[in-house]
């Protein structure tokens, strides 16, 4: 079922954004498209949009219950959610609890190393530039956010990390790392935006010791491991069971 909506405002790799009847709101449709390596690798996976939409909804609801402001307002259909309109800050906030992926490729840190405190990195959100990592000096040079906003972003991201870590741990899942996107609503409030799903989180299954079988996230697509929909379905099953 497709909810009533206005014109298409934006289409990204994984979602479409439409105007909504409600003021200061938009409707987000989650697509079945899977992409990796800045969309150099692509596929369409039936059911992926529904899974990511439903998982994101449950996680946004959990964060809201814990007092974390998000753009989420409610589900509009299986693959649609109603959210507050926000001015997205062009940064990807990445929090790493365990070393893996690009961190191990760029540093001598061994894969699997627990990072305490968690490592927080900011990346400039621009596919054409390859989403480069920003140093503090480059962040100031670009003038994307103020020093106060930088502090607020880090505090919010670390709070989200604590909540997600505990939540996933209760489901026998390890939150290895994840990406957050943030935005400002009309009142200037900093909100968690975009989505929180296996597309944006690395999640390992504590119930499985096999280094490949334990992967329940987008790395199954990146690494051609197969079983992407089954893995995402397992995440939704556990999240809904809480």
Swiss-Prot record:
Q: In which pathway does it act?
A: Purine metabolism; IMP biosynthesis via de novo pathway; 5-amino-1-(5-phospho-D-ribosyl)imidazole-4-carboxamide from 5-amino-1-(5-phospho-D-ribosyl)imidazole-4-carboxylate: step 1/2
The top EC class is ligase
EC id: 6.3.2.6
Task: Show the GO MF annotations.
Answer: ATP binding; phosphoribosylaminoimidazolesuccinocarboxamide synthase activity
Q: Does the keyword Transmembrane apply?
A: no
Instruction: Kindly give the InterPro entries that the UniProt entry links to this protein.
Output: SAICAR_synt/ADE2_N, SAICAR_synt_PurC, SAICAR_synth, SAICAR_synthetase, SAICAR_synthetase_CS
Q: Which GO terms describe its biological process?
A: 'de novo' IMP biosynthetic process; cobalamin biosynthetic process
Reactions the enzyme catalyzes: 5-amino-1-(5-phospho-D-ribosyl)imidazole-4-carboxylate + L-aspartate + ATP = (2S)-2-[5-amino-1-(5-phospho-beta-D-ribosyl)imidazole-4-carboxamido]succinate + ADP + phosphate + 2 H(+)
Q: Record's NCBIfam families?
A: purC (TIGR00081)
The family database entries (PANTHER family) matched by this protein are listed as: MULTIFUNCTIONAL PROTEIN ADE2, SI:DKEY-6E2.2
Instruction: Report what the protein is called.
Output: Phosphoribosylaminoimidazole-succinocarboxamide synthase
Its source organism is: Prochlorococcus marinus (strain MIT 9303)
